[in-house]
Amino acid sequence: MKVKEIRELTTAEMLDKEKQLKEELFNLRFQLATGQLENTARIKEVRQSIARIKTVLREQAN
């Protein structure tokens, strides 16, 4: 997700999206461990999206 897209979400939507991405990251890591993951770059994309959401949430808290 782009930061612009994240900023358009409400706080509840951001928290929900973060939860979904964490679940996806868990599944991707599981697939990587079992040798089923084809697109390993997706792990990096998901991690960066989680970080972007956390950054925007932190900015809004201040």
Swiss-Prot record:
Single GO MF descriptor: structural constituent of ribosome
A cellular component annotation (GO) from this entry: cytosolic large ribosomal subunit
Pfam families to which the protein is assigned, alphabetical: Ribosomal_L29
Keyword RNA-binding: no
InterPro entries xrefs: Ribosomal_protein_uL29 (IPR050063), Ribosomal_uL29 (IPR001854), Ribosomal_uL29_CS (IPR018254), Ribosomal_uL29_sf (IPR036049)
Keyword terms of this UniProt record: Ribonucleoprotein, Ribosomal protein
BP GO annotations: translation
Coiled coil stretches, renumbered: none
The UniProt record lists the keyword Heme: no
Source superkingdom: Bacteria
UniProt record similarity statement: Belongs to the universal ribosomal protein uL29 family.
NCBIfam families, per database record: L29
PANTHER family the UniProt entry points to: 60S RIBOSOMAL PROTEIN L35/50S RIBOSOMAL PROTEIN L29, LARGE RIBOSOMAL SUBUNIT PROTEIN UL29C
Protein name: Large ribosomal subunit protein uL29
Gene responsible for this protein: rpmC
